[in-house]
């Protein structure tokens, strides 16, 4: 069983913000396969699906970003999911908008949702898909920037990166070794 977690903030207010690009990827996978998040438990909305012979859970924590681990850890425990079978998808200020980067494991890099995930799982050893959102180019505080919406001129780059991230996740679910997926999709 695989667990795909998109990090973001719940509610309409945050729906199209940079910080919610992890949710965008889950939404892309749901739309591609006509799946729905039809379960609400573990402080998250999730769906249990089958893809290419593999059971897959897609999760959008509803805890707000900084508490994401509170949703992920109990769901993993309940379904007995090994950390090797988890991918966490989230925004990255240090990558330009439109770029994606996959990692086998690592630190939180200042990302509070990832920090919470590490704290609750007790390990840094989970796979990640990071989607670039760039940094503010003016004096905009980082918190205002990540909670802001993408400008229209970035729509194509964002859409492309979300689709590539979904493609990478699907390749991994189908059984391609994660290191090969990294080689194929890292930009």
From Swiss-Prot:
Feature type site, description Stabilizes the basic form of H active site to accept a proton: 91
Positions contributing to tRNA binding: 14, 64, 66, 112
Localization annotation: Cytoplasm
Site (Discriminates between blocked and unblocked aminoacyl-tRNA): 9
EC class: hydrolase
Active site: 19
UniProt EC number: 3.1.1.29
GO cellular component annotations of the record: cytoplasm
A molecular function (GO) term: peptidyl-tRNA hydrolase activity
Catalytic activity field: an N-acyl-L-alpha-aminoacyl-tRNA + H2O = an N-acyl-L-amino acid + a tRNA + H(+)
Sorted UniProt keywords: Cytoplasm, Hydrolase, RNA-binding, tRNA-binding
One GO BP: rescue of stalled ribosome
Entry-linked NCBIfam families: pth
Protein task: Hydrolyzes ribosome-free peptidyl-tRNAs (with 1 or more amino acids incorporated), which drop off the ribosome during protein synthesis, or as a result of ribosome stalling.
Family: Belongs to the PTH family.
Record text on subunit structure and interactions: Monomer.
Protein name: Peptidyl-tRNA hydrolase
Origin species: Oceanobacillus iheyensis (strain DSM 14371 / CIP 107618 / JCM 11309 / KCTC 3954 / HTE831)
């Amino acid at each position: 069983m695989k667990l795909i977690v998109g990090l973001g903030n719940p509610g309409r207010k945050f729906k199209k913000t940079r910080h919610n690009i992890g949710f965008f990827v889950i939404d892309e996978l749901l739309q591609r396969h006509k799946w729905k998040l039809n379960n609400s438990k573990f402080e998250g909305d999730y769906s249990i699906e089958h893809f290419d012979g593999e059971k897959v859970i897609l999760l959008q924590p509803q805890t707000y970003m900084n508490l994401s681990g509170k949703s992920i850890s109990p769901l993993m425990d309940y379904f007995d999911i090994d950390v090797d079978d988890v991918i966490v998808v989230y925004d990255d200020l240090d990558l330009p908008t439109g770029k994606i980067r996959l990692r086998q494991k690592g630190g939180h890099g200042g990302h509070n949702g990832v920090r919470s995930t590490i704290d609750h799982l007790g390990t840094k050893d989970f796979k990640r898909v990071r989607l670039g959102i760039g940094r503010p180019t003016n004096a905009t505080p980082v918190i205002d920037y990540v909670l802001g919406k993408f400008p229209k001129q970035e729509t194509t780059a964002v859409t492309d990166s979300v689709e590539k991230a979904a493609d990478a996740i699907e390749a991994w679910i189908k059984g391609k070794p994660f290191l090969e997926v990294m080689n194929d999709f890292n930009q």
